[in-house]
Amino acid sequence: MITGELRSKIDKIWETFWVGGITNPLEVIEQFTYLLFIRQLDEVETIKENEAVFLGIDYKGIFPSDMQHLRWNQFKDREAGEMYQIVLNEVFPFIKGLHQEGDSAYSKYMNDAIFKIPTPAMLSKIVDGIDNLELGDKDAKGDLYEYLLSKVATAGTNGQFRTPRHIIRMMVELMKPTPSDFIIDPAMGSAGFLVAAQEYLRDNHADLFLNAGLREHFNHDMFTGLDMDRTMLRIGAMNMLLHGVDNPIIEYRDSLSEQNTDKDKYTLVLANPPFKGSLDYEAVSADLLKITKTKKTELLFLALILRILKNGGRSATIVPDGVLFGSSNAHKDIRKEIVDNNKLEAVISMPSGVFKPYAGVSTAILIFTKTGAGGTDKVWFYDMKADGYSLDDKRQPIQDNDIDDIIARFNKMDEEVNRKRTEQSFLVDVDEIRKNGYDLSINKYKEVEYEAVEYPKPQEIISKIMTLEEEIKQGIEELEKML
């Protein structure tokens, strides 16, 4: 989570945008992100230059020798008017033109990017503010993006809530992406899941970059992100490029419509799809309605995931609690489809405070594998009580954190067999789930131990009351004598 100092600095920059007339939060984020991107391009270039010197090899960077003045560390200290002209007329066209040699995701969505900062003085103040942000590690950069995105007042009007990075990382750790995976987030937002997946691969499969085929797959075919918000597509494309993925497949597409024809294509889905949207039947792909006839986006996305996964493909998806126990035919149909025709592996119940202060909804993570032929045997349930942060609007860091325990228990499923229903995690046989109408809420199967409380006998209570009454009577008599 973001530190108080970083939050304060971002708020000051945000205020500069606001005072300068850019008051739409999405526009602020977009302009803020362009300048962050320009700064980080220079930082990445400097790191690569230093590595080349250390290794004694030639390095051809993205800034040609005649364009060195376009680098952040070259223009940031210039006089306001001169800086403004450089950024407006040279730097911004330069970043829009990156990767134009191919039909890259980045170039596709940067084509209609517009530089909107109106005055040299405003730009100078914003550049100073961004230059003073301490962004030395990837956590700080992630915190900054997360906090910026939290300021979008419209996020959530269509049910899209940002997923906290530590929850994203947990889901990625549980799914263990491999170098041969085809990974998709069908409601990608700023590409948080895709960024976390590529970080996991760099940390755990660094040798993939020594293999030309795997390296090509990583940079061009492995990652797919879909969204209907062009601003978020731009931010997501910049986010992936800054994290070293050259050309992910990022597309403007309504995942639930007939426009999306993907089927049996991906090996891993990581998603937190919109919860609160409600669509007309006409806007939804007909084959999704065959699985579950509903207007609810959270159910339709589960049907979509089953369609787009290859057999053997896995999914970790966040759903609102209502998906787990909803009594409508549509709710039951999608749960039945996952349990009976595929392999449901885990239901991780999360506390409602996980999405605060932006949403107080209770959620769970469903982990399943597409088989098309069943396979559900025992389903693992975990009752997450803490995620390392307070569950109020402040979300301050605390000691209690179940995330490491969740990952450890999930990876040692053999040891879960003997756990009791009174423990934080346990296994439930699929037949019991069927008997309970495919209810997947943990409270349906959890057992609570009640400690026996011994109360005094009625005669003892009456005796104590009478003694107390006598003491009160004596006290009143003594008080009357004093008057």
Please describe what each predicted stretch is.
Residues M1-P179, I249-N260, S349-G353, G375-S390, ...:
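Non-catalytic, mostly N-terminal accessory regions of nucleic-acid modification and defense proteins
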Residues D11, S124, E216, D246-I250, ...:
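Short acidic (Asp/Glu) and glycine-rich catalytic loops that position anionic groups and cofactors
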Residues T23, D280-K296, G322-A330, P351-Y358, ...:
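Short, contiguous acidic/charged loop-to-helix segments that flank catalytic cores in large enzymes
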Residues V28, M228-L233, I250, K295-F368:
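Conserved Class I SAM-dependent methyltransferase catalytic core
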Residues D42, S190, R230-T231, S257, ...:
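Conserved nucleotide-binding/hydrolysis micro-motifs of P-loop NTPases
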Residues T157-A271, K276-S278, D287, K295, ...:
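Conserved S-adenosyl-L-methionine
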Residues K343-L344, K356-I406:
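C-terminal, active-site-flanking charged/polar segments
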